[in-house]
Each structure stands twice: as C-alpha cells, then as structure tokens.
Amino acid sequence: MIAELEGIDIRENEALKHYTYTQVGGPADFLAFPRNHYELSRIVDYANHNHIPWMVLGNASNLIVRDGGIRGFVIMFDKLNAVRLNGYTLEAEAGANLIETTKVAKFHSLTGFEFACGIPGSIGGAVFMNAGAYGGEIAHIFLSAKVLTPEGKIKKISAREMAFGYRHSVIQETGDIVISAKFALKPGNHDSICQEMNRLNHLRKLKQPLEFPSCGSVFKRPPGHFAGQLIMDANLKGHRVGGVEVSKKHAGFMINVADGSAKDYEDLIAHVIRTVEQASGVRLEPEVRIIGESL
C-alpha cells in the first residue's frame, strides 16, 4: 500500500491478462481504479513527483499487453463511466462502455451512434483510435473532449484539434488521455435505430469470431484492399502459433484458442505481415497496439 494514495483502489503486481480481451498480459506493478477526477489527479501527481511511469489502459479491447507486463502505474477507468445527455449532446466519461453508451442513445431515440453498437471497448479508447465500422466512425459525431496531459493538467480539445484520420487521432502522438468526450447526435425514429443496430449486430455475429478471446481487427485496411482477403489469399486462414490462431471465420481476426501468450500473438502477426507481403507486395499495418515488456 502506498500511504500517499490511501483510499484509492490500487492493486500491486496484478496480472493484466484478467483485464484484456485477448486474455494475455503480464503483471502491472500498480493497477489503479480511480473513482473520480480527484483520485486520478492524485495518482498522476504522485507518479510524476516520484518519476514513476504511468499509463491508462482503457478497456484493452484492441490491445496486446506483452507477457512481461507493464512497469509503474496502469490506470483503468472502469469506475469513471458516467453517461449524460444535454439535449442532443451526449457526454460520456472515458471508462463508459462503448456498446452500453450506444444503448443510451437508442433509448432516447438519438441517431448517429448506431455504427458502434457492437464495437467492444471504452469511450476513451474509441476516441483515441477513432473507432469505426460499417461506414461510421467517432470523428463523424465527435464534438470535444476533456483530456489529461502527461504533466497532469486537464484541458479541452476540439474536433478540429483532434485531427482525426483513419484509426488515428492527435492524442496518439501527444500522449494526452481522454477523461470524457461529447458527441453530437440527432433526433431519430426509435424503431429505425433499433432495426439498424440489430442488423449490424447480426452481421458481426455472422462474420466475426465473437466466441473467442481476441483483440478485434488486427490490421488496418490497406488502400485498395481488404486485410482479411489478403490473408486468405496467402493461405493463412487457420494458421496457428502456439495458442493463437488466424480465425477461420474472419481472417482479419486472431483468436486465443488454447491459453496463448502475447508472444504467440506477436509472432503470428509478424508471420502474417511477412507472408502477405511476399504473396501480394502489400505490407499490412497493425491496428492493434502492442505495449509492455517481453519476458
């Protein structure tokens, strides 16, 4: 227990595989769950003052944590998950579940968030990655965000300043951490919104291996191609390294089928990149983030 942070939920040497969608990942020195912005500021101030590294993990849905884990503080926003409506503006804290947030919009007959109805992860991670699917993306509805700078200061970032691109935002370079975000929605027909969300969720169940642990879509879509098709054309569907396999259902996914490790994921990703480039001349770029230390 760290005396200066008494009262905050902090767990020492906690295995991160219990918190990641891939079910892989070594220990964090300190895993912290702040309940509010004050506790978050206390953690960051303490870490910065004592020169201890810190990072925010989010919901760890499009992420691989290496088997050696992460040094310093890993902060999770599970308890910072409030969702509020002000007219047609929806504001959500960074730890709010993305799928559950789309249900709030649906309940109030607000349209614009349907594309995200089946995307796993948190609001903070969705903004960070400019998450998207089926023609929609966060950039289309984003208004502004409150962020925590690496120095521990809170500031506001506009949609223009966020400089969204394909699976990209400026905070991937600046190191700013989303605390909350506002989205501009529109009044819609409740039945139409429900039908569209049901349609998209049906497509996901048909095409994606949702029954297995995975990190979601592994590669960005290369211009003029589909990553999954390139992987299939290279005869890699079902290819396995250790306990991790290229999904037979959707080659753009890698699934943990037999107690796989982060190293299995990394080795399989590297093999797929090499083989696809040799077969097609196209070099795939990972969409998934890989962090932490190797064993």
UniProtKB/Swiss-Prot annotation:
Cofactor(s) the record lists? FAD
Q: Where is the FAD-binding PCMH-type domain?
A: 23-188
| Top EC category | oxidoreductase
Q: Which UniProt keywords apply?
A: Cell cycle, Cell division, Cell shape, Cell wall biogenesis/degradation, Cytoplasm, FAD, Flavoprotein, NADP, Oxidoreductase, Peptidoglycan synthesis
* Associated pathway: Cell wall biogenesis; peptidoglycan biosynthesis
| Cell cycle is among the record's keywords | yes
Annotated InterPro entries: FAD-bd_PCMH, FAD-bd_PCMH-like_sf, FAD-bd_PCMH_sub1, FAD-bd_PCMH_sub2, MurB, MurB_C, MurB_C_sf, Oxid_FAD_bind_N
Q: Short name of one Pfam family for this protein? A: FAD_binding_4
Give one GO term, molecular function aspect.
FAD binding
Q: Which reaction does it catalyse?
A: UDP-N-acetyl-alpha-D-muramate + NADP(+) = UDP-N-acetyl-3-O-(1-carboxyvinyl)-alpha-D-glucosamine + NADPH + H(+)
Q: What is its EC number?
A: 1.3.1.98
Where is it chiefly localized?
Answer: cytoplasm
Q: Which segment of the chain is annotated as a signal peptide? A: none
Which compartment or compartments is the protein found in?
Cytoplasm
User: In which domain of life is the source organism classified?
Assistant: Bacteria
Biological processes per GO annotation: cell division; cell wall organization; peptidoglycan biosynthetic process; regulation of cell shape
GO CC: one term?
A: cytosol
Q: Which residues form the active site?
A: R167, S217, E287
- Membrane-spanning parts: none
Explain the purpose of this protein. Cell wall formation.
Q: Which PANTHER family match?
A: UDP-N-ACETYLENOLPYRUVOYLGLUCOSAMINE REDUCTASE
- Family (UniProt): Belongs to the MurB family.
**Name by which UniProt lists this protein:** UDP-N-acetylenolpyruvoylglucosamine reductase
Taxonomic source organism? Streptococcus equi subsp. equi (strain 4047)
